[in-house]
Amino acid sequence: MLRRKRAFTDESLMLMERGLPRLVTTSTTPTPTTEPTTEPTTTKDETSQTSATDASTATTSTAATSTAATSSTSTDITATSLTITSSSLSTDVANIVPPSAENNPYIFRTSALSGTVFIAVGSIAGAILMLIFLWWSITKYLNYKRTKKDYLESMATQYPYGSRGGHAHHSSIFSTASSDVYSYGGDDEKLSLGHSRSQSVDKKTHEKVKKSKIGLFGGSTNDIFKTPTRNDSWESLSDAITNYGDGSVHRFNPIQDDIQYNNRRSLFISPTVEVMNLPRQEVPDIFATPKKQQTSIYNDYDTPLIPDLSKPEDVALSPQRSHRKTPSNDKYHRRNRSSANLSPSRSPTRTPIRTRNMARDHRKTPSMYLEDLLDDNY
């Protein structure tokens, strides 16, 4: 029995070498074994002797069993701990060495730099963009020059006295006047000095003429910028200036521009416009003769400039209150696109004050009517 148990214990230890350690406890119950005897017991002493022998045998077997169980448990734990501490893992890696590329026909070799294709494509695209930018710049510059040239030509056509013509006439009048002034001295140096001064003042005066009221009101500058000669006098030059001021400056007249005056949509009355619409007072000409100072430059007949205030009919029929017909009126309406000359005037015609006074003399006053009634009653 003990051999079998030891053999079983050794087999279990061999099977449990790689497992986890565990505590194994075994318990055995002693079973008495008796061998059958063929010989009968005849005496009482022999029977008691046999019982004592069996009891001692059973006790011995129980002690041996417990000793074997304890020894097997301790041996199992020791074997398991020894197996865990002695286990190890080792791996072997092979060292790979690539073969040499020399004399190998299957390896591609190149001498160009890396990214050559990208550099080539970028260079072509940049060249195209540069060509487009150059074409745009040249086209813009040519268009600017062409537009500036057309603008200057149109300005010279629309305003001949503001850009080129006025410049020439303006320079000519100053140069001629200076030459006339310095020619009486008989000195050529003074003549050249006056001509150089006229050229230096030319630019400043040209800008002033462009920004003056002459260009705003659109008057003709043929008279004032007419080049004088040596035979012309200062009186003729002053007459030209006076005629220029007479025929070019016109204000808004509600009687002449009847359509624009009646179509007003605002009830506001501007005092500035009313003052500007008043008859203009003429400035006496300091270069004219005394006879010309007393006459008006708007008519051909001799009429006093300041009428006699004691006679109302003269005041009513004075040239300042009558409609002035000058050659520049047609230009004024044509420039403003006004149809006042085409449509009849809606303003009532004025009758002379003398005629109205004569009509009033023939009428009867209320007192005269009462006197007639009283006379009839008597």
Curated annotation (Swiss-Prot):
Primary residence: membrane
Sorted UniProt keywords: Membrane, Transmembrane, Transmembrane helix, Vacuole
Feature: compositional bias, Low complexity: 25-41, 48-70, 343-356
Bias (Basic residues) ranges: 321-337
Bilayer topology term: Single-pass membrane protein
Location within or outside the cell: Vacuole membrane
Superkingdom, taxonomy of origin: Eukaryota
Disordered, as annotated region: 18-70, 299-368
Any single GO CC term annotated in Swiss-Prot or TrEMBL for this entry: fungal-type vacuole
TM helices/strands, residue ranges: 118-138
Family named by the database record: Belongs to the PRM5 family.
Protein name: Vacuolar membrane protein CAGL0J10076g
Originating species: Candida glabrata (strain ATCC 2001 / BCRC 20586 / JCM 3761 / NBRC 0622 / NRRL Y-65 / CBS 138)
